[in-house]
Structure formats: C-alpha cells, structure tokens
C-alpha cells in the first residue's frame, strides 16, 4: 500500500511484523561499470551462517523466483570469492551450540563443497577461538586453555589446527585463494589482550616487546602451516581499525618480528567511519597506500550497507533507525550499490588493491517477521542460526548476552544489511558484482626489487595487467640504487590470471642508500672535508666546532661512512666523514635530555652561573644568589653540563641553572 499498490487495508498485515513481502526485492538499483573492476577483482562475500540457516530450512531464490542454491545465485551474479569463518569448538559441555552460524570446521566444509561446484575461491578466516574473536574479545579455545601460558605449545596448537583444517578443505576440492590468520587482531589474540579495566590499549600488546614477540610467534606458526599446505594462497592479516597511526604501529611490530604475509586487510563499515563518505573513503585510501608503502596487497575483509532500517526477525539489528551515521547513503538497495561503488573505486585505484568481502550478505531470518522472534530464537538454540544462542550463556560475556536484564540472543542482528530480502529473494543490489565489471581477467605481477645478491632493497611493487595485453610502467626511483642502464621504463605482459612474481635487479650506487640516522652531532675534527655531493665537490661552509643534525648515514663502497648534515632549521649543509663528528643526543629528543626527578633543597652558592627561563638560553632577571629553592628535576644536557629546575616552596617555577651553582642542604 505504501508503495502505491492496491491492497485491502482492512486485512493488511505489516510484512516486517508478520513476514510477508516487504517490497525490497522490487526496488530498483542502478549499477555502473567501474573502470578498474576486472573479472579477477575480489568480489567476495562472507556467508558463514549458511550451513546453519540451511539446516533450519531457510531457502534462497534466483531472480526468476526459482528456489536454488545460495552459492549458485551468488555465482550467477558475479560473486567470485567466499569467506568462511572458522571456530575451533563453538559448543558447550552439553554439546549445545553457541550460535553465530555454529561455524566449526564441519560447517565450513559444507559451504566449501558447494562453492567448489561453481569454481568459487575461498578465503578461510581462522579466529583461533571457539566463538566471536574481535577487538573486544579474543578468547583462547577451551581445548588450548591448559597451554595458554606455554608459548611453544600454543604455537604448536596454532600450527596443527591450521594445517589440519586446510587439509580437510583441500580434500573436498576447495580452491583456497586466501587464508586469514586471526580475525580483527587490532588489540591482540589468544587472550593476549589489553587490560581494559586499567586503561590499556593495543600499545600494551603490539607495542610491548615481550607481548608482540609472543603474538607474532603465533602468527608465524599459522603462516608456516599455510605456506606448507597451500603455497599459492595469499596470507592475510586483518585489523578492524582504519586508524593510520595504529595500523602503522602494529605493522611495525610485525616487521620487527619477521612476520611474512601478503595482504593487509581492514574492516570498512561506513556507518562506523563517521558521517561523511568522502572522509571515510579518504581514510580507506590512506590505509591502502600504507599497505603499498610496505610492499603489501590490500583488501577490505568486511563491509556492508543497509537495505532498510527495519528489523525482520524480532532481534534488534546492529544498525537501526536511531543510528547517527545510517544516512551516509540511502537505506535501500540503491544505497548498497552506491556504497559498494564508492568503496571499489577507491580500492581499485591502486594496483595493490584486490577488492573486498561483503560480510554476511545472506544472513536472513529463519522465519521472517518480528512476531516470530520465539521461533527464530528456538532455531538459533537448535542450529546456531542467530548471532548467539542460549548455549553461549556462561561462556560469552553477560554484557553481550543480555540487554537491560533480558536475553539479547536469538535471531540475526544483520538482516537489514543483506543482499536478500527477509524471505530469501535477491535484491537488485546483488547485481553489482556482475554488472560493475568492465575488464577481462587480470594478472597481478609482484615486482621484487633486488640487488645483485637477490636481497630485496625496496617495497614490492604490484602491477595489474589484463591477460593478453601489455602495460608500460615506470620503475620506482629511490636513494642508493638504479635499474640496469638506468632505464626506468618497463613493459609487462599479462600471460595468465592470478599472482606471479618477477625480480628486477637494481645496481647499488657507490654511496649506497640513505640510512636514517637522526642524531645531533658536533664537528670535532678539522682534517675531514665537507662535500656538496658524492662526486666529491668540496663545500666552502665552515663546520668545525659547530653542531648539526645528521639525518642520514651512507655506507660508501670506499669503506667510509658519511653523514648528511642539516641545520636545525632543516637546510642541507653537506656530507662529511662520520669520523669527523662527535655524536650527541637523538634529534627527536630535546638537547637537555630527559627530566630526572631530583627533589632536593638547594642553596645558590655561586654568582658566576646564569639562571635561564628555558633551554634556548633566555636569561632570567630573577636574583637567586644565596637563596634556597627546591630542585625538582635534573637534566643531563648534551653540552656536557647538568642543570637543575628550580622551584619556590609554594611550587612556582623559577628557572634552570647549572648544577655547579648550588649546594644541597638538608
């Protein structure tokens, strides 16, 4: 009736309440071709709840209204990748399911068998937990609980479970294209997590050397199993955060600990990224560029958008009518297409961008209509079809299982973000995955930039080339190396779909690459010359006894090390032999160094030392000779002197003075 159709209003029943046709499947959605969307772009979907839903009797239909396999509907409409979450043992001691799709290995294998019939690739998403693993909770599997304080046993557990599971998927004919080692591990995994009650953050896990080493050991154990079982599969590490600084710090921890992976992945939900699609997409581009700078491919591991703000099964949805950012796009199939279009255009603008996975795009109610909430709850308790089931009580935290003292588990909390209506009919937005494709199959060539010994000297470059075509590229220019004949132009040919590796040998310059140094130095020896460049053109600048910032170090082929000197203002001065200087403090730290707690009463005994307002040596007019103060802090300045910060008894700051000027009094 609301859509302009003639109905008998006296007998009309709200379809959201009673489970009839909501009209969503009839809403149009316009899809445009995307310039960089190829047949090989990852157009994936997580359908982990499918096995549980199927057991409960849920049916899916094609666009002709014919009942058919969910995998066939997805395949026929352009979805080429399926993501499956894997939990170790999502049941309690009575064998009752925790819900959430009941995603043990057996449930995943059922999906894999069906996907194999339609030549769809799989991404295996290892949570290394018995239930939901996310930034808030990363619980050790029950069977591993006894080992959680034994790092070596835990690494073996991770390795064995990963390897055994992959082999089982291979045995049913699964085409494993990607393996995700850990799920949304922003704050840690396997119970190595921040103590939120103490205000701890990811910095206390990934930023803590001991914790990071253990965590990276677990990642490396899982990755080792992947490399051994399915060497062509791409290893993916997944953070929920879109924060540039946070992602960069965590990637640094992985690099320091030698974690070998191929793809950096993020969760990208626009309703949690702010109220501006422009800002969210700019953030997405920054994270993709971050992955590129580290020589990694990039993919969105989870995304979605709303088909409606309505609830269709009696369990409150994650995003509903009161959500602040639910209007970034329209809440209908066209809004879903628009959200996917913007995201894919951003993702595929870089050659390291693979594509994305739509999260739980088919998690519809078992029985549509929120008046059927009890039936949906019962089905969840029996088959695990809801986000959680009664069997998870006592295992999953009460603050998640209950809301205002009432059970919050039962049905799907995602039914208004699917690409199907509540009765299993596809929405027009599903056609995005087929209709947006504008190119044929692609080859992704990973260019490894190496020296003559095969050592990588620069971040891996990724180039997409359409199969059967050629593409001209410009090789990267960077300090210390150059390609053969200094020719930076290269032509690549697409010969096969998939990922291949090609090495490009660079020659080292005599000076070599610029190595970050970043110390203040004082030139203490006159016999060494200052040079404008490494062609040994001398500089006339007088540097003896002066202090500079040495930003970079060069290990020259002549056996000497040279420093690139800069003024404090950042102006380049020249290159000088490292033996000519005395190293002072780090350029990232103040010249006076750290403030050490001192806390002693002192009396000024000498008049020859000046009092300063700051360490830029601005003199104070305050008369302090023969007066008594509290020296709260002591500084070891890189000029060789020690200074004290003086305060009055009432706590007022007075100034800084050389420690030789005072006498400690009791």
Task: Locate predicted features.
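Surface-exposed interfaces of beta-sheet-rich extracellular modules
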Residues: 469-494, 555-564, 639-645
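Substrate-binding cleft and catalytic face of glycoside hydrolase catalytic domains
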Residues: 73-233, 240
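Glycoside hydrolase catalytic-domain groove-lining segments
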Residues: 70, 230-234, 242-324, 341-348, ...
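N-terminal carbohydrate-binding accessory modules
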Residues: 7-77
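Conserved, mostly hydrophobic/aromatic
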Residues: 45, 74, 125, 179, ...
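Beta-loop motif signature
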Residues: 452-457, 511-566, 585-647, 652, ...
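Aromatic-rich peripheral "rim/lid" segments of glycoside hydrolase catalytic domains that contact
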Residues: 23, 308-339, 357-441
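Conserved "repeat-terminator" motif of extracellular CCP/Sushi domains
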Residues: 441-444, 449, 492-512
């Amino acid at each position: 009736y609301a859509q302009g159709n003639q109905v008998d209003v006296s007998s009309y029943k709200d379809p959201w309440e009673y489970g009839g046709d909501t009209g969503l499947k009839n809403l149009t959605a316009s899809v445009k071709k995307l310039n960089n969307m190829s047949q090989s772009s990852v157009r994936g979907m997580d359908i982990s709840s499918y096995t549980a839903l199927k057991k409960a009797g849920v049916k899916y239909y094609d666009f002709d209204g014919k009942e058919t396999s969910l995998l066939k509907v997805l395949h026929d409409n352009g979805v080429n990748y399926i993501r499956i979450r894997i939990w170790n043992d999502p049941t309690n001691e009575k064998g009752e399911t925790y819900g959430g799709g009941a995603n043990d290995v057996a449930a995943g294998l059922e999906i894999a068998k069906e996907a194999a019939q339609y030549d769809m690739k799989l991404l295996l998403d290892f949570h290394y937990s018995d239930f939901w693993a996310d930034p808030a909770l990363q619980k050790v599997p029950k069977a591993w609980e006894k080992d959680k304080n034994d790092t070596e046993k835990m690494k073996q557990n991770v390795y064995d479970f990963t390897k055994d599971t992959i082999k089982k998927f291979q045995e049913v004919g699964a085409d494993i294209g990607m393996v995700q080692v850990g799920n949304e591990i922003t704050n840690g995994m396997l119970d190595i997590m921040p103590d939120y009650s103490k205000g701890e953050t990811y910095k206390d896990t990934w930023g803590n050397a001991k914790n990071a080493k253990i965590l990276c050991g677990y990642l490396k154990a899982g990755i080792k199993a992947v490399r051994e079982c399915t060497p062509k599969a791409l290893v993916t590490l997944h953070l929920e955060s879109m924060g540039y600084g946070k992602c960069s710090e965590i990637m640094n921890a992985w690099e320091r600990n030698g974690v070998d992976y191929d793809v950096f992945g993020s969760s990208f939900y626009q309703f949690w990224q702010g109220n501006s699609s422009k800002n969210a997409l700019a953030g997405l581009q920054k994270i993709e560029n971050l992955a590129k700078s580290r020589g990694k491919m990039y993919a969105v591991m989870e995304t979605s958008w709303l088909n409606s703000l309505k609830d269709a099964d009696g369990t409150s949805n994650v995003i509903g009518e009161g959500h602040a950012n639910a209007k970034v796009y329209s809440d209908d199939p066209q809004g879903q297409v628009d959200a996917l279009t913007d995201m894919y255009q951003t993702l595929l603008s870089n050659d390291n961008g693979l594509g994305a996975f739509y999260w739980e795009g088919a998690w519809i109610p078992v029985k549509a209509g929120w008046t059927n909430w009890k039936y949906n709850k019962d089905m969840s308790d029996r088959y695990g079809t809801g986000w959680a089931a009664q069997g998870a009580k006592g295992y999953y935290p009460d603050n998640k299982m209950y809301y205002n003292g009432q059970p919050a588990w039962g049905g799907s909390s995602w039914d208004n973000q699917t690409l199907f209506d509540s009765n299993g009919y596809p929405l027009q937005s599903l056609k995005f995955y087929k209709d947006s494709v504008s190119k044929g199959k692609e080859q992704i060539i990973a260019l490894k930039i190496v020296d003559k010994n095969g050592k990588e000297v620069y971040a891996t470059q990724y180039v997409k080339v359409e199969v059967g075509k050629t593409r001209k590229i410009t090789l990267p220019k960077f300090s210390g190396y150059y390609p053969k004949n200094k020719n930076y132009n290269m032509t690549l040919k697409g010969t096969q779909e998939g990922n291949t590796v090609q090495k490009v040998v660079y020659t080292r310059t005599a000076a070599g690459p610029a190595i970050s140094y970043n110390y203040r130095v004082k030139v203490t020896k006159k016999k060494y010359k200052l040079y404008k460049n490494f062609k040994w053109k001398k500089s006339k600048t007088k540097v003896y006894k002066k202090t500079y910032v040495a930003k970079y170090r060069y290990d020259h082929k002549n056996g000497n090390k040279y420093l690139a000197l800069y003024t404090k203002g950042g102006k380049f001065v020249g290159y000088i032999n490292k033996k000519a200087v005395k190293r002072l403090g780090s350029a990232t730290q103040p010249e006076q160094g750290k403030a050490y707690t001192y806390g002693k009463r002192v009396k000024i005994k000498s008049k020859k030392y000046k009092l300063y307002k700051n360490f830029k040596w601005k003199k104070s007019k305050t008369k302090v000779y023969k007066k008594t103060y509290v020296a709260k802090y002591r500084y070891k300045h890189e000029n060789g002197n020690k200074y004290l910060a003086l305060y009055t008894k009432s706590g007022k700051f007075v100034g800084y003075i050389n420690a030789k000027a005072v006498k400690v009094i009791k």
